[in-house]
Amino acid sequence: MTMLHLQNLFSFNTRVPINKLFFENNTHFSSNFSYKIRSNNISHLTLGIDHGIDSSSSNFIKALSDHQGDVLAKNEIGIIDFFEAKNLLVTGATGFLAKVLIEKILRTTPKINKIYLLIRAKDKEAAFDRLTSEIIESKLFKCLKEIHGESYESFIRSKLIPVVGNIDEPNLGMDCIISQQIAQEIDLIIDSAANTTFDLRYDLALDAHVNGAYQLMMFAKKCINLKLLIHYSTAYANGEREGLQYEKPFIMGESITKEKLTSHSPSAKFPLLNAANELDFVSKLKNSIKNNDEFNKIIKELGDERAKLYGWHDTYSFTKAMGEMVIDSMRENIPIVIIRPSIITSSYEQPFPGWIQGLRIIDPAIVFYGKGEFPGVYTNPYCLIDMVGGVPVDMVVNATMAAIAKHGNLQSPELNVYHVASSYVNPLLSSQISNYCYEFFSSFPFVNSKGDQVKVQKMKYFDNMLDYSNYISKELLNRHHEVEDSKMQKLFKRKVEFLKNCSKVYEPYTFYKGWFHNGNMQKLMEDMSEEERKSFDIDLSKINWRDYIIGIHIPGVKENVLKGRM
C-alpha cells in the first residue's frame, strides 16, 4: 500500500513542528471564490496540447494511452456474491487505504459476515476507542450512515471486530485465544499494514515490511479456510529499473543490480539478496553498538546504502520489495494477490469525491506553493509522474475487490501481481501538475494573516540540486528579509532546509525513468460485467487530470486535511 505521510519524513535536526514551519501565518482560502466539482461525464485528456510539449513527446505519450481500446465484458466476476457470508482479517485497519476499503465493502456487500480489524492499541478498550473515533465517526462513512439511518451504529458494530495486534509480532501480536478463533474463521486476509516513510530507519523498515511479511505468512498457514491473501506493496518496488515495468513477482535472491549486471554480462557475479540475512545483519549490528545515538545514525544511513547497493531508490521501496520476496518464498499453496499502487490520492467518485486522510507525497508541496513558499521545483518537467496523478484511492479499492473475487473464486495456488497506476494508460507530466496548481491558486488564492490574497507565480524547474538549493535559499530569505525577529529568521531558514530535504528525498521519483504496465488490470476489467464496471470502476484511462486536480484533489485536501484553513 502506497500511502505516504509527512510526519517524521525528514532527518534534519529541528524541534519546530512541521505545522509551525508552514502554517504559522494562519493563511486560509479566500472566501471570495468558490469551486465546482467536475461532472461525472468527463472526457479523456489528450496530452501534448497547450502544455508546451514538443510533437515527439506528444506522439510518444499518446501512444502509451491509445492501447486501452474498447472493453466489452461478456461475463462477470461476481464481486458482490463472493463477499457474502465471508470473514476477513484486515491489517493496518485505521490507515487511509484500509478505511476506504472497509467502507466500500460494507456499503456494497452488506451481507459480509465479519471483518476483524487488527489495530495497534494498548488494550481492548483502546482498540474499541480507535474503532469509534477513527472509523465509525469518520466523515468517510457518511454515505453508509445515510443508508442505515438510526441502525447505522448497530450495523457497523455487528460487522467490524477490533482486535489488538501488531503485524511484526508472532500471531500478529494477537491474544492466543483470539488468534486461534480468527484462524478458524477467516476466509480472506487483506494486509494493508506498512510504514510509508521513504527514509525510515533500516531496522524499523525491516521490522514493518520484512519481518511483518514473515509473521503474516506464519499466521496465514494456520488459517484452515483461507481462500486468498492480499498484500499491498508499491509500484515503486520496481526500484531503479527503467522503461516499461511489467507485473512480475520478485523472487528471493534477485535484485535490480543483479538484473542490470547480467543483462550486460551473463557471467557476472553479484551477491544474492536474502531478506533473512538482512534481518540478521541488522540484529548483530544492533547488539554490537551500545551507544543509541551512534546506532541511530549508522542504521539510518545503512538503509539507503543497502537499497542503492541492490538497485533500489530508498529504504521504503527496498524493504517493500523484500517483503514481496518473503511472501513468495513462504506461500506454498496459499493463493496470493499483490496489489502495487503507485501513489494513492484522494477519492475520485466514491463514497464522494475528494476524501483524503493526511497530507500525502506532493500535497505539502501543493500547499506550500499556494502559500507562496515554493517558487521552484527540482524535477524534470517532462517526467511521467505517478505522484499526484497516481491513482485515486477508490480505484485502488475497486481493483482490490475485483481481484479478490476473481482469484478467490479460482483459488489457484498462484501469486498474481497488479500494478494499479496511471503512467501507462493515462500519463501525466510533472509540468502539467504545476500548471494545474497555478490555475487553481490563481482563481482560488489563499489569504494571509493580513487579509491579502497570496499571488502565485509560474513554477520554475531545476535539474541541478545545487542550483535549486541556491534559488530556494535566495527566494525565501529575500521574501522574509524584513522580519527582524531572530526566532522568525531561524524559522525561515528551517523552511529552506525542509524544502531542500523534501526535494532530495523525492528526487528518485521526480526524475523517475519508468512507467508501470497494467495488463492484469486490463484483463480484470474485461472480466467484469457492465454493471460491475460501473459499481467498481477501475478505468484509469478516462480520468481528466485537470478536472481531477483542480476540481477534486486540491479542494479535497483543503476540506479534509486543512479543514478550510492553513
Q: Where is each model-derived feature located?
A:
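Hydrophobic structural elements of the Rossmann-like NAD(P)H-binding subdomain
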Residues: 230, 339-340, 420
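Hydrophobic/aromatic anchor residues within beta-strands of the central parallel beta-sheet
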Residues: 162, 229, 336, 472-474
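NAD(P)-dependent short-chain dehydrogenase/reductase
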Residues: 241-317, 321-410, 424, 433-441, ...
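Amphipathic terminal alpha-helices
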Residues: 40-53, 59-62, 66-69, 112-116, ...
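Mid/C-terminal beta-alpha module of Rossmann-like enzyme folds, strongest
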Residues: 403-505, 510-517, 523-541, 560-566
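N-terminal Rossmann/SDR dinucleotide-binding element
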Residues: 4-25, 32-197, 201-206, 214, ...
